[in-house]
Amino acid sequence: NFIFASISTLAREDVLSQFARDHFDYIIVDEVHRAGAESYKKVLDYFNSKFTLGMTATPERTDGQDIYRLFDYNIAYNIRLQAAMEAKLLCQFHYYGISDLTIDGLSVDDSSDTRFLTSIARSRHIKEAIDTYSMHEKRKRGLIFCRTVDEAKELSERLNTLGLRTLAVTGEDSEAVREDAIQRLQSDRRPDMLEYLVSVDIFNEGIDIPNLNQIIMARPTQSAIIFVQQLGRGLRKAKGKPFVTVIDFVGNYD
């Protein structure tokens, strides 16, 4: 007997109180790098299972929380990105760092105003880079990560006017809208199929699109965790996908 639940649901008092503390023999926690959050602590502190397994691709946190301590520093298995790629568990990636664009004498970077980040000039700059480095993909399927929701929406509109098929998907959208957007990206047959989903961070984790073949970073991040999460969206192996193309417009490679 198995129960699948989100932490947000399980942490609710009316749900958690339905279970005895020793109700579960095994507890498996996905995305356990979030376990420093109060909702995770509440659930993990409540249950007294015989065995608890935490899984994450990014165990390190930037807020000082020690996830390893929650498991008494017992590591069942550990494999890093490079080792996973060498073992052919993940697909290879081709990485292209694109130099900053200068608009009206100003260099577009992470501190730039949204009007520059979503300008026609920068949108064309992004489109030209996509055209240049997409020569190997017969059918483009990509995620574009932006800094803000407004930027994601405006950039999507700009890229659509330049001939790409994109859709901005944000936390404001329902689960049904997000699922439909993913299906449109995956499909080869739908007349409304998409080439790119543009978002801020809702696709950093928790999605599975094996045939994704492009990751486009139009946002900066000082977090190695977020960088690896976003890169990891494209590293699932799939038939006919020898590698994923990563195009970085904001110098994350520094």
Where are these regions (language model features)?
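Conserved helix/coil segment N-terminal to the catalytic DExD/H
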Residues: 1-26, 37-42
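SF2 helicase motor core recognition
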Residues: 12-14, 88, 197-212, 232-236
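Conserved segment of the helicase C-terminal RecA-like domain
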Residues: 223-229, 233-254
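Conserved interdomain linker/interface between the two RecA-like ATPase lobes of SF2 helicase motors
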Residues: 75-143
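Structural recognition of the conserved hydrophobic beta-strand(s) that form the central parallel beta-sheet
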Residues: 3-6, 50-57, 196-199
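Post-DEXD/H (motif II) to motif III coupling segment of the RecA-like Helicase ATP-binding lobe
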Residues: 26, 33-95
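Conserved helicase ATPase core of P-loop NTP-dependent helicases/translocases
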Residues: 15, 153-154, 164-203
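Conserved RecA-like ASCE P-loop NTPase motor core of nucleic-acid helicases/translocases
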Residues: 140-148, 169
